[in-house]
């Protein structure tokens, strides 16, 4: 990757930008641009990590989403039903009036777990997703 810096423009909700700026100040970043570069590097590293998840795994997928967004709840349920053979359990609770937190506990092949997580993350209204996996240990 070259050293040339590219100028880009992005649109963000004001509340998200304010929170980002406060985080940058607390962490001592010299500029918003450096914070965005760091966030993109972290995002890319996470994507690379997800590509390496292979083999039999136990996992949790933690999701925060806006349940007032049209279709988010039904789409989430439809996707989960496609992976019903992998999902052991899920827990759902309301954080606020329009904000829900859900944890899905599952077991399956790493590639399928990642596929499920990526499909959920692509739903409009999903604000946060965290995937945690543990390789299955074989008893010998």
Swiss-Prot record:
InterPro entries per the UniProt record, alphabetical: Acetolactate_synth/TF_NikR_C, ACT-like_dom_sf, Arc_rbn_hlx_hlx, CopG, CopG/NikR_regulator, Ni_resp_reg_NikR, Ribbon_hlx_hlx, TF_NikR_Ni-bd_C
Keyword Secreted among UniProt keywords: no
A GO molecular-function descriptor: DNA binding
Gene3D superfamilies per record: ACT-like. Chain A, domain 2, Met repressor-like
Entry-linked SUPFAM superfamilies: ACT-like, Ribbon-helix-helix
Obligatory cofactor(s): Ni(2+)
Pfam families, per database record: NikR_C, RHH_1
Cofactor: record remark: Binds 1 nickel ion per subunit.
Binding of Ni(2+), residues: 81, 92, 94, 100
GO BP term, pick one: response to nickel cation
Domain of life: Archaea
Keywords for the protein's UniProt record, in alphabetical order: DNA-binding, Metal-binding, Nickel, Transcription, Transcription regulation
Similarity section: Belongs to the transcriptional regulatory CopG/NikR family.
Function field: Transcriptional regulator.
Protein name (Swiss-Prot/TrEMBL): Putative nickel-responsive regulator 3
